[in-house]
Amino acid sequence: MKTHTITKDQLDDQNRYVGEADLTSFSGHIEISADLGFVKFASKLVATGRIRAYSGSGIEAGEGIEAGWGIKAGSGIEAGEGIEAGWGIEAGLGIKAGEGIKAGEGIEAGLGIKAGLGIEAGLGIKAGLGIEAGL
């Protein structure tokens, strides 16, 4: 499976992704290099494989974030809509979604987990601070 790695040269001065690859429906893995801060995506971020942001990098999408495998970020994960992974979702800081959060395996955050709708995991849900869901 191919991997697209996001580096600093693919970001504008507001840390928005401006690279040439279409990451709204990517066939493969998406990786975000370390120490980039929160990398912002105007709409959704979708990969058939995993989505991973290394230490010091986080993911922020205007719409949803979806991975066929797992989603993991050294910092936080935030989506205007839902977050869904076939495997687990893990963030060094918080996980926040305007709608639901769903993982085939576990959901884990160093701080809080918050969803506008429900939170569902095939295995456990763990947060260093609170867990909050609208429904």
Residue ranges, per PLM feature:
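Charge-rich, low-hydrophobicity low-complexity segments
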Residues: 1-92, 96-109, 114-115, 120-121, ...
